[in-house]
Amino acid sequence: MSLVVNQIVGNSYSCENFNETKQDPIEILPDELVLEVFSHLNLATLGTICCVNKAWKRLANEPILWKIAIYREIAFGNDKWAQCFGPDVVKDEDNSEEFSSLPSDDFIADCKKFKSIFPERNAKDSLMLVRLSKTLNGGLTLKSLGELAKNYFSASDTGYEFICAPIIQEQGDKSINKSQWVLMTKDVLPGSRNKSYGEQQKIVADLAEKSLISYEVPETLESATCILSQYFGSNIRLFSDSPRTYTRCKDKVQGYQVVVGGFAPAGLCVIYRNYDRDNIGVAALRKF
């Protein structure tokens, strides 16, 4: 004996027992109800149910479902900033605009492109999607970001394991023009280590020309925010000290490119260097 739900007037339903062949619940329930259920699934499950049949695939392929799952599972957005530091840290942000502007389709497309270029890498685990909130902690800067980092690295006066004094003096109070989403690689690009900055710029430019359109060398504040966000949310030290890894940034201080990384248990390093080494490569970042 099986239970079947038949839709009647409005949003009310009646139930009846019968001995006939079981019906697919997708064919019985209204699309709105199925989509509500599917909205609680993770990315892996959404991908799996697309293979059940055409009806399931039609509903599971709704862009809003993937957007919700990516926001919840992949993105480090205002909700995660608030979870880590309290709601006041993003109290002046527009959360509706934040979600509507989430580049979920671009994230999926770039993951596929990244996989085609670097087949040895897991694409989903190679890109981080981070919200750079202009008003974060009163205004996103290297200094205010460091104040947040002190919650995790209390032994540091700045929130960083080390940040060069001239960087604080020249860039410490600089912010961003607007709140925005960015995609950044979780590691330096293959083949970018121990190269001059000019060579690293060309590596990123060639990548952008081939497939990953609009990717560029990251700036110091962007790099530090993205790298620290992954630690705040998941306790993961990207661009770490094992093996020691830095990304070069666009910014110059005292004539030298800033590098960010060497993320040790004591915190992140933001320094500047005038030489090429195997531990200095370059990441790639895309703004939205």
Language-model features: where?
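A binding-site-centric feature that preferentially detects glycan-recognition modules on secreted/surface proteins
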Residues: 71-216, 221-288
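Skp1-binding F-box subdomain of Cullin-RING ligase substrate receptors
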Residues: 4-74
